Amino acid sequence: MQKYEKLEKIGEGTYGTVFKAKNRDTHEIVALKRVRLDDDDEGVPSSALREICLLKELKHKNIVRLHDVLHSDKKLTLVFEFCDQDLKKYFDSCNGDLDPEIVKSFMYQLLKGLAFCHSRNVLHRDLKPQNLLINRNGELKLADFGLARAFGIPVRCYSAEVVTLWYRPPDVLFGAKLYSTSIDMWSAGCIFAELANAGRPLFPGNDVDDQLKRIFRLLGTPTEEQWPAMTKLPDYKPYPMYPATMSLVNVVPKLNATGRDLLQNLLKCNPVQRICADEALQHPYFADFCPP
């Protein structure tokens, strides 16, 4: 740790405290994540270390770079590139108004980061505005990729904040244990709607039951035909048969017709029907978009 000088505490992440720090040799500003482990007596599980070391190979401009892994006497500190703010803070500063072109740019960058990681069989599993970081150049980067697999997703953060269910798909809420890339695509859909509404969450549920009700009230309760595997999921229980909202115009009024179509393809209750990141990048919504 002598290599890095702590400058200030940035906040509490899902896995522990995050500090802004400076590399004493290069003077580069970095973010240090001290990972607190539940079973501190055991030290760092070797499986977690293996997973984390794989993440150092994820090099893409829309992924927060993991520079270094510092492992000493039962402590694990991850050294990441530093970004100025997360999407949640960005929303707070934009006063309920977000330019449609910025929405499109952020969504494109989010999908680019997802496509890259998914092509390497790395899932995020806990995407939310707090782990989408934005630097001074308006570049969006996905943080905490792969950490869920290495450490599991705790029920509570270390700041005692409950880990949010707002971005979880119905299959996961019904107890699905076999995750695929579709879990991240649902989260991307929720974030897309939140971008379009300048920071208003789409499904701000209070618990699993409320979360599923909010989803089904908007999208319609899936039938056995629409989602055959649903009733076999471990925590499945029947819900009232809500009809689907005919149009998303009132839900995301500032999103154009092609944007609403992309959103509908991301928010499919049946994970098999959800669009993948590569397909989403080819969607007509991005036809007139010129990546920087």
Curated annotation (Swiss-Prot):
Catalytic site positions: 126
Enzyme class per UniProt: transferase
Keywords: Acetylation, ATP-binding, Biological rhythms, Cell cycle, Cell division, Cell membrane, Cell projection, Cytoplasm, Kinase, Membrane, Neurogenesis, Nucleotide-binding, Nucleus, Phosphoprotein, Serine/threonine-protein kinase, Synapse, Transferase
SMART domains given in the database record: S_TKc
InterPro entries xrefs: CDK, Kinase-like_dom_sf, Prot_kinase_dom, Protein_kinase_ATP_BS, Ser/Thr_kinase_AS
Residues that, per the record, bind ATP: 10-18, 33
EC number: 2.7.11.1
Membrane topology: Peripheral membrane protein
Main location: nucleus
Residue list for modification Phosphoserine: 46, 72, 159
GO CC annotation terms, alphabetical: axon; cytoplasm; dendrite; growth cone; lamellipodium; membrane; neuromuscular junction; neuronal cell body
GO terms for biological process, alphabetical: axonogenesis; cell division; neuron apoptotic process; neuron differentiation; neuron projection development; positive regulation of neuron apoptotic process; regulation of cell cycle phase transition; regulation of dendritic spine morphogenesis
Protein kinase domain boundaries: 4-286
A Pfam family annotated for this UniProt entry: Pkinase
Compartments, record wording: Nucleus; Cytoplasm; Cell membrane; Perikaryon
Catalytic activity: L-seryl-[protein] + ATP = O-phospho-L-seryl-[protein] + ADP + H(+); L-threonyl-[protein] + ATP = O-phospho-L-threonyl-[protein] + ADP + H(+)
Claim: Nucleus is one of the keywords in the record: yes
Gene Ontology molecular function: acetylcholine receptor activator activity; ATP binding; cyclin-dependent protein serine/threonine kinase activity; ErbB-2 class receptor binding; ErbB-3 class receptor binding; kinase activity; protein serine kinase activity; protein serine/threonine kinase activity
Positions of modified residues (Phosphothreonine): 14, 17
N6-acetyllysine PTM positions: 56
Phosphotyrosine PTM sites in chain numbering: 15, 239
Task of the protein: Proline-directed serine/threonine-protein kinase essential for neuronal cell cycle arrest and differentiation and may be involved in apoptotic cell death in neuronal diseases by triggering abortive cell cycle re-entry. Interacts with D1 and D3-type G1 cyclins. Regulates several neuronal development and physiological processes including neuronal survival, migration and differentiation, axonal and neurite growth, synaptogenesis, oligodendrocyte differentiation, synaptic plasticity and neurotransmission, by phosphorylating key proteins.
Family that this chain belongs to: Belongs to the protein kinase superfamily. CMGC Ser/Thr protein kinase family. CDC2/CDKX subfamily.
UniProt protein name: Cyclin-dependent-like kinase 5
Record organism: Xenopus laevis
